[in-house]
Amino acid sequence: MVDKPAGNAFDVLVVYHGTVMRDALVMQAANDTLDAFRGLLDDPSIMVVSVAYPEENLMIGDNLVQAEAALLWVKNQAASQLGVQIRHIFLGGHSQGGYLVTRLNTLHPTRGVIANAPGPLDLVLRCRLEEDGTIAAGEHCARLRNAYGSTTANPSAYMARSLRSFTTGYQSDILFVQGLEDSRLIQMESWPGFRQQVEACTNCKGVQFLELAGLGHTALFNSTQARDAFRAFLNARR
């Protein structure tokens, strides 16, 4: 989904939506995410590409293939297919989209990455909570359990797909935004450890964290402080 302003040369923001369990809902999620990120920008000349990646019947992380393909299209084919000049490329993602852009940052350099409430951070913890009935069971953990067994039997397989396993080797500057009133068990229980791991990285480009009290999972889109930080991050790298 491409939102191309008038003109011939563009900086491009490639954005990734959050979790959508059914592929029939993906296009709407991509459109909503395009609108949400477009609303943060203070420059209408930026082209926004919203990626409608699949999720139905996939395990967490398997859709990195489609997420990467979209980025590579922007890098290598968008200019010729759209008849434009591509200048700088930025990535933005919310929730599972934040997970994907963080992982993409270990694979490909861009001009910068913004990840809001990225996750899942720790699938061992999350799926164990489902196994013991603390939180409601969901499809993602069920697929992992069918493939790997329980978190007790095979924790390393769950951790290998968790974002806490991708906290080094960031090839571009990244801004993490996190509302501190996000889900306590699913997100905030793992957030301090994730941040500590990232801040200990010795082979990452610049890393910034913005934590927002009183805000939840969609903090980036509900805070003037987050909006201003988002704009400052982009504008400093254009």
Residue ranges, per PLM feature:
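Short beta-strand-to-loop junctions in surface cap/lid or active-site-entrance loops
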Residues: M1-A9
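Short substrate-entry loop that stabilizes the transition state in hydrolases
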Residues: N8-F10, G18-L58, R184
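C-terminal catalytic histidine-bearing segment of alpha/beta-hydrolase fold enzymes
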Residues: I60, V177, R184, S190-R195, ...
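Gly/Ser-rich "nucleophile elbow"/oxyanion-hole loop immediately N-terminal to the catalytic nucleophile
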Residues: A69-S95, L107
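Short glycine-enriched nucleophile-adjacent loop
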Residues: G98-H108
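A conserved short beta-strand
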Residues: P109-P120
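Mobile cap/lid helix-loop segments that gate and shape the active-site cleft of serine hydrolases
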Residues: P118, L123-F166
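Short beta-strand/loop motif that positions the catalytic acidic residue
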Residues: Y170, F176-G179
